[in-house]
């Protein structure tokens, strides 16, 4: 095997090992997050709502407002909410 192939093999192995380490860290973090949700649930918090709040906080205000407007439009079309009063 040429030296170039050996270098490529070593680089590939290094990438794979880094990915494996990061995947393990990701699993550890996911387990930690699950534990926090469990702790919050034990204190009486609704974990579904907590997850929604976390997701909303990731979005900027404009994006949230656009999504809420579209949701309202869909709910209105399905008769699930009334039209907002026109002023």
From Swiss-Prot:
Q: Which InterPro entries match?
A: GapR-like (IPR018753), GapR-like_DNA-bd (IPR046367)
The GO terms describing molecular function are: DNA binding
Q: Name one Pfam family in it.
A: GapR_DNA-bd
Q: Which domain of life is it from?
A: Bacteria
Where does the sequence pass through the membrane?
A: none
The UniProt family comment states:
Belongs to the UPF0335 family.
Q: What is this protein called?
A: UPF0335 protein RHECIAT_CH0003797
């Amino acid at each position: 095997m040429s030296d170039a192939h050996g270098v490529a093999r070593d680089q590939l192995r290094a990438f794979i090992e880094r990915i494996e380490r990061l995947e393990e860290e990701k699993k550890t973090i996911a387990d930690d997050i699950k534990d926090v949700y469990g702790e919050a649930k034990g204190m009486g918090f609704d974990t579904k709502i907590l997850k929604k709040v976390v997701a909303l906080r990731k979005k900027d205000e404009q994006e949230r407002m656009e999504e809420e407007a579209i949701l309202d439009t869909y709910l209105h079309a399905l008769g699930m909410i009334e039209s907002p009063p026109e002023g």
